[in-house]
Structure formats: C-alpha cells, structure tokens
Amino acid sequence: MKYDLVIFGGGTSGIAAAYTASKLGLNTLLIEATDVLGGAITQGLVVPVMKLNNDGINTDFYSDLLEFSKKYNAQNTFSDGNTGWFNPELLKLVFDDMLKTVNCNVLFSTTPSNITFNEHNDNFTIDLKHKILSLHIETQYIVDATAFGEIFKILNYNFQEKNNLKQACSLRFNISNVNLKIFSAFLMEIDNNREISPIYETKEGIHLSTAYTWDNDKPWALAPLFEQALQNNDLKANDNAYFQLFTVTGMPNTVAINAPRIILDDFEDIQNPFTYSNALIQGRERIYRLFNFCKKYLKGFENSFISHISDTLGVREYCRIKGKYTFTKEDVINPKTFDNIAFACDYPIDIHSNNKKNDELTYLSKTCYVPIQVLICEKNDKLYGIGKILSADFEAHSALRTQMSCFSMGEAAAKDIFNKINN
C-alpha cells in the first residue's frame, strides 16, 4: 500500500493534519497507538481548549471542529468568548465523524516496528504492527505527531539538547454529582474576583471555573481552605501546588479538575518507563486526597464522586525535535517576521515547575508568528514533527504547546506537504 502522507499520532495536531490533508485530496493514513482519537482532549481530559489570538492563520480545521461538535451538542462558548469548551467523551465521536467525512484512512492499535528512508526512491518504507498482525506500507511524507518523537527516534534524527529545566506533569480527573447551584453560590460568597472565578448561566445550566496555586501573585480565594487542609493533614506537601476547576459541556453537575501537579525529582526523566509509571501511581494517590478535600471543604461537593480519571499522564514536554529553525524565547517576546507562517500565538510563557522559584507566567505584549521550519526535520524535508515536539527552546515551547496551536500546526504541515506534492 502506498500513501502520499502517513501521520503517526491521533492527538490534536495529528487529527488536524490528517483531516486537512484528506480534505485537500491527499491519500492519507493516520496511525494511532490506542483505540481512540483525540489524545490530550479525549484521553487526558484537557478541556477547555485555552483561548489565544491565532490571527486566523491555519484555523480552518478548528472552524470545522466547531461545526461538527455542534451536531453532537459537544461544544459551548463561555462568557469570555472562548469557543473551546468541549465535551471530551463526545469528541471521540466527533473526530471519527470528521475523518470519515473526508475519507481519511485510520488504523487504531497500530505502532511502527521499523521505518526506513530510501534516498534513491525519495520515500519511506514502514513496517507496522497491529496486535499480532503486520503490515508493510510506503509513503512520500511522514508527520510525527506522537508527542514523544517516536518516528524521529526510530530514524535516528536529532533532538534539542536536554537541560535541567522540566515541566511538571499532571493527571486530570472529573468529579460528578456536584450541586453547582450551591457551589456557585459558595464561590460568589468567598470570591468577588470574576476573572479568577467566572460564573456563567447558560441554557444547559451553570458554567464556571476557579483556581488556586501555591504562587502568591494573585488573591486566591481558595487559599485559606488549602492552608487549613494542609494544617489538618487532609492534604500533603505539593498537593496545593496547582488546582483548576472547570464545568464540562454536556455533563451536568460534573467538574473537571486540572490537578494534581506531579512533582519529579531533578534527576528523574519522564521518558524513563519506571518514572512514567511511578508518576501515574503518585497521581492517582493524590487525586483521592484532592477529591476528599473537595468533599470536605467545598460546599456542593458533599454527595459527589470521582467519575473519570485521565487515561493518560499529562506530560507537557517529552522532547523537542531539531528542525530547520528553532524558535526561541526571544522570538516569542520580540516577534520577528518570517516567510511561510505556520501559526500565530499570543499564549504566555507558561512554565509549571517542580518548585515555586522556577514557575513562570509571562504574558506577551505582541502576537508571535511561527514559521513552518520549526515543524520540518533539519535533515529531511519529508519528515515533519508537530504538536508538543516542535523545534523550540524550553521557554518558547511552553507558550507554543497548547491545543489551539497544535490544531494549527497540523493544518499547516498538511498544507505545506500538499503544496510540495503538487509543485
């Protein structure tokens, strides 16, 4: 079997690339290691999609995603105009529907066992493994959207050098049977800051969010409750590092919790399988403490229960490829002019550190424009790396890694490949 384009990884960037390429008429195959598309959204419970100014650059996929989601009542628009309040379960159906509509080939539970680039034929030969069966395919182009650079590793291409800086991981979870009427009244009583704790009445009910972190840069209304829980030994050290709460579209009386922050020692590498596995165990243990904290300290949670724990660890950064251009912190803060822009972004430099002193949230005064070269392998024009593995330094990566940017990266890569094939 021969394809124009094979994409590995059916997360946010991979889906966007597959959908766009197929819509443009390329013979496209999307390969996903699990049994569901969506990655961080559907398996990691990462909702809502964070709002940013993308300047309308490579946003066609996202516009279509909104239209498909409305068919399933899987999307809502929050009071601040953020259209990214999705239902993570229903998006599993939405993504299938989108790819089926554009006749994209999809293989689930499939992984690469070997990949070779043939310089003479200028294409890739790929051996795939599905359960106990094997497949052999060929393709002109590959897009690595695996989040951990699996294809770059197999082909032995370079990554950015490691340093001691690292992002903390998380393991999200949902709590259901929350009395949102009581909880919203409780929030109104303790927090008059509607930027931190916005509350919004919609036709489907109450939508809200709130937050607390161990940083002292904002007047966190939940701070006294976390401090009391620490004193009472209801929470342990670092359980209070980061806590965000959102209601979920189409899930009445359910809230999504962006916590716990999983703290790794300086010498630990999340790519180590033992470190990764221990992080999951630590995360689930701490989820139960945070759940009991909510039941005891937050009004409206008295009869609640844990309804879903993320199926995958929330890793903000595994590795970063070496592309034809490496985007830097300076490029984010003082934007340059580039040809062939892949996406625009004004999301802050957002570093979730292992300790307070290295946390950073630096808002941008200008929108930065990211060139397609950060998505192309430095040594092979036919290999792209998109999503969380884009070519950037540590600080720039923290601003560029969000889901909205990942959607645009996938779309940009697909369009660039289409143009190369047709020229």
Name each model feature, range by range.
Residues 116-136:
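Conserved beta-strand-loop-beta-strand element in the redox core of flavoprotein oxidoreductases
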Residues 40, 135, 139-141, 145-422:
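Flavin (FAD/FMN)-binding glycine-rich loop and adjacent Rossmann-like elements that form
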